[in-house]
Amino acid sequence: MEEKLAVSLQEALQEGDTRALREVLEEIHPQDLLALWDELKGEHRYVVLTLLPKAKAAEVLSHLSPEEQAEYLKTLPPWRLREILEELSLDDLADALQAVRKEDPAYFQRLKDLLDPRTRAEVEALARYEEDEAGGLMTPEYVAVREGMTVEEVLRFLRRAAPDAETIYYIYVVDEKGRLKGVLSLRDLIVADPRTRVAEIMNPKVVYVRTDTDQEEVARLMADYDFTVLPVVDEEGRLVGIVTVDDVLDVLEAEATEDIHKLGAVDVPDLVYSEAGPVALWLARVRWLVILILTGMVTSSILQGFESVLEAVTALAFYVPVLLGTGGNTGNQSATLIIRALATRDLDLRDWRRVFLKEMGVGLLLGLTLSFLLVGKVYWDGHPLLLPVVGVSLVLIVFFANLVGAMLPFLLRRLGVDPALVSNPLVATLSDVTGLLIYLSVARLLLEAV
């Protein structure tokens, strides 16, 4: 947003200048206002939503968090509520009402009463679907025609239907029972002879999803096919809605956030850091940290078991951090590559043997390369007795950690656990435990032979 416009908005709010504020709000783009939203005081946000042109107010509201949506829908005056609800697209309206329903079921019913009967029925139909499925993402505001219509008839129909449709770039063809039969683009219509029938120019090979298709699969299909719109059908193949690219972008952001949380063993996928308190953050992180520290306690037992070796050659302790850190980093690299390959379907569970053999070679090459560097450091430190110990240990640690990182995602997927949730933290912990065991075992074996 232009700095001048942002300053004007803040000044108008501070001074309570309603006329100046209306002028700024007429000019401002909803996305620019959203970028400034967190900087506005609570009472100023309320004023902005009250005075914004209704289309812009609906756009801003649709991009707020569910908690904020519920808050404003419960506090705005009835006349303003009605205006905003009428402007929201059906899918955004359903999402906003669901946010209120979770907070206050009684008020949710009052909001529904503000809707006309047709809109209320459509919103209730959308509310039956899970939020993370295609049915929860779709909007029923699509354009569908019959295959027996001519191009001229379709164009006349589009002129009437376009104002209420989410998009008219793609027109879907259905039979008399509403079952999806084909698709054609607006371009197809424009270049076709007006007397041509839809059945002659439509594409009968339609890529679609069902109402219960997971949102991540919906996003993947749209990305793979470069679609801006994807039709949604019910269990009988009847067209019930469309998913548009703007909804998929929100899904991709949510899925990316969820995956990043999982990689760090934070198992609250919808966590918003700026809105979470200390207790919520503690609950999101503590469970896996407890599990991992209990696993990591094995390392103290290993150290106690090799106490005599460490006492005999105290310099062994100097290289524990770099050995374990290198093993953990190697395992995490390997796990990240495999998790991503599984997520993008570059690999599936049947590929584990091929991956195992490939990563054996990769692990050996990495181990030899890194061992060469660390052995040089050991020599420089003046510990020639430890050269074979550190060199052999690092090769084995890296080799083993690389295999663990590559195979663990396959094992977790086989067990029905999301690999992204525990792979990296678990790989790091297992690498520490096994790395320490390898290092001290090699030390005992080689030093006793000297």
Curated annotation (Swiss-Prot):
Mg(2+) 3 binds at D95, G136. It is a multi-pass membrane protein. It is found in: Cell inner membrane. Changing E258Q: Abolishes the Mg(2+)-dependent suppression of the Mg(2+) influx. Changing R285A: Abolishes Mg(2+)-transport activity. Highly selective magnesium channel that plays an important role in Mg(2+) homeostasis. Functions as a Mg(2+)-dependent gating channel. Exhibits low activity with cobalt, suggesting that it might also be involved in the uptake of Co(2+) as a micronutrient. Also exhibits low activity with Ca(2+), but it shows almost no activity with Mn(2+). This is Magnesium transporter MgtE.
